[in-house]
């Protein structure tokens, strides 16, 4: 099956942000985090991970800020309850292999669900003890409007601080 959204990956990335799967709005727009209620683009700008507020159709511009994008489930679109049953060991391996190949400094899951599904169990927000090669792994709160009840922007700010400290 074809990927709903193509990975935005290349060498020399500082960060790879990984969602669970493309939402239906993102799949239709062929752009990551495209739903108007999604806070993804605003939090990237608010935390100064991007110096400008990008729009979803500008997602390829993230490469100039050394940020890449992918999803845990590449072959499905929709809410987690629709896409997660499609998650396979091959999806986890594909992500690990991509991280090993491109070697970003950080892999950050953009939802607790994505991180927990990758690791196969309960996890807290923040930096994880495991690494993929030398890549540090974080679990961040979901930016989806459907997850407003668990929105914690301070964790995104902590992550951005760690990214800047790693560069500094």
Where does each model-flagged region fall?
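Short glycine-/acidic-enriched loop or helix-start segments at secondary-structure transitions
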Residues: 26-29, 117-120, 149-150
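Internal catalytic-core helix/loop-beta-alpha segment
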Residues: 64-123
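Short N-terminal binding/cap micro-motifs at the start of the first secondary-structure element
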Residues: 13, 23-28
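Short amphipathic alpha-helices and their capping/turn segments at secondary-structure boundaries
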Residues: 4-10, 53-62, 98
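Structural motif
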Residues: 14-15, 106
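C-terminal capping/extension of enzyme domains
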Residues: 3-14, 35-36, 43, 79-96, ...
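Short, surface-exposed acidic-centric catalytic microdomains
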Residues: 26-87
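N-terminal nucleotide-binding beta1-loop-alpha1 segment
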Residues: 17-20
């Amino acid at each position: 099956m074809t990927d709903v959204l193509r990975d935005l990956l290349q060498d020399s990335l500082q960060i790879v942000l990984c969602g669970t799967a493309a939402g239906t709005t993102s799949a239709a727009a062929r752009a990551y985090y495209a739903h108007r209620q999604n806070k993804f683009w605003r939090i990237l700008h608010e935390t100064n991970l991007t110096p400008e507020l990008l729009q979803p159709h500008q997602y390829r511009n993230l490469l100039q800020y050394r940020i890449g994008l992918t999803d845990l489930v590449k072959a499905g679109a929709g809410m987690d309850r629709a896409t997660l049953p499609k998650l396979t060991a091959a999806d986890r391996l594909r992500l690990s292999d991509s991280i090993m190949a491109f070697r970003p400094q950080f892999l950050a899951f953009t939802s607790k669900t994505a991180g927990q599904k990758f690791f196969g169990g309960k996890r807290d927000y923040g930096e994880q003890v495991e690494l993929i090669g030398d890549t540090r792994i974080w679990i961040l709160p979901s930016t989806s409007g459907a997850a407003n009840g668990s929105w914690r922007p301070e964790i995104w700010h902590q992550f951005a601080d760690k990214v800047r400290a790693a560069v500094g």
